[in-house]
């Protein structure tokens, strides 16, 4: 199956390979409607199953699958990695390119591009101090005691591994379903988190969020160039004193 390199998609089926971590996938999902604007007959999204219900609200996606080696994901006319979409948007005709700005002045969907029905949990702050156990886990993760000093204990833990000092979320399967996570997050006052997937979910939902950055040498490019999420404010590790006031303004 050939990689899509900008050929006509009229009457064609294309498989989009979700890449990198959950945050990256949520961040780049805003560009998926572009493929339908370019005439794709069918868009197949190959991704982790925990994201299926969340992205089910996007009518531009015709089929979801988590089977990379057989079935519908292997039967398309083309395939493309989701992170490559902005590049091909930059090469698209003006009528399509203008619908999906991606530059320092404006990034499409920065105001929020996903919906969620708030759950019925009492309104509190949401917190997450830990990232997935990848290469940058110890760079981005914050000591929970330090997070407690900054935000207090009147909050829900959105860390799927442990709750520590904060209230647990209902045991409803949210740890394996990003759509349920979105519903709980939408019910919260706001979110304080380190740089991890929940930050992107909050931004995509338009939830007011403070993202605590790692040391400057490890700060991810996405927080340096353009505004991906209007509802997200970043703070450096020497600016933690600003967080209580940012919480009060949520």
Locations of the language-model features?
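Nucleotide-sugar donor-binding patch of glycosyltransferase catalytic domains
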Residues: 83, 91, 203-250
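Donor-binding and catalytic core of enzymes assembling or modifying cell-surface/extracellular glycoconjugates
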Residues: 1-9, 148-210
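A nucleotide-sugar donor-handling region in carbohydrate enzymes
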Residues: 49-54, 61, 65-124, 130-131
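Short, polar loop motifs at secondary-structure junctions
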Residues: 47-52, 67-70, 158-165, 196, ...
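Conserved catalytic-core segment of nucleotide-activated headgroup transferases in glycan assembly
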Residues: 23-31, 37-38, 114-120, 125-127, ...
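Non-catalytic membrane-proximal stalk/linker segments that position and tether the catalytic domains
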Residues: 1-12, 108-117
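Short acidic-hydrophobic, aromatic-tinged amphipathic segments that line or gate anion-handling sites
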Residues: 63-68, 173, 232-239
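N-terminal pre-catalytic "stem/leader" segment of glycosyltransferase-like enzymes
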Residues: 9-54
């Amino acid at each position: 199956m050939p990689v899509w390199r900008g050929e006509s998609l009229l009457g064609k089926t294309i498989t989009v390979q979700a890449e990198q971590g959950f945050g990256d996938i949520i961040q780049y999902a805003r560009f998926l409607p572009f493929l339908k604007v370019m005439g794709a007959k069918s868009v197949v999204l190959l991704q982790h199953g925990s994201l299926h219900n969340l992205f089910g609200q996007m009518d531009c996606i015709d089929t979801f699958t988590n089977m990379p080696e057989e079935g519908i994901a292997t039967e398309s006319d083309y395939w493309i990695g989701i992170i490559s979409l902005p590049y091909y948007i930059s090469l698209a005709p003006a009528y399509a390119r203008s619908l999906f700005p991606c530059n320092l002045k404006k990034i499409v969907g920065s105001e929020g591009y996903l919906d969620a029905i708030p759950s019925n949990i009492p309104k509190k702050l949401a917190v997450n101090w830990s990232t997935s156990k990848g290469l940058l886990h110890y760079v981005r993760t914050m000591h929970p005691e330090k997070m407690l000093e900054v935000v207090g204990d009147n909050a829900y833990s959105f860390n799927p591994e442990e709750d520590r000092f904060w209230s647990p979320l209902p045991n409803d399967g949210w740890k394996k379903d990003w759509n349920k996570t979105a519903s709980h997050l939408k019910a919260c006052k706001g979110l304080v988190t380190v740089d991890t997937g929940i930050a992107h979910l909050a931004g995509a939902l338009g939830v007011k969020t403070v993202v605590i950055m790692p040391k400057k040498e490890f700060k991810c490019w996405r927080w340096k160039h353009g505004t991906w999420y209007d509802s997200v404010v970043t703070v450096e590790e020497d600016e933690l004193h600003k967080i209580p006031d940012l919480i009060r303004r949520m």
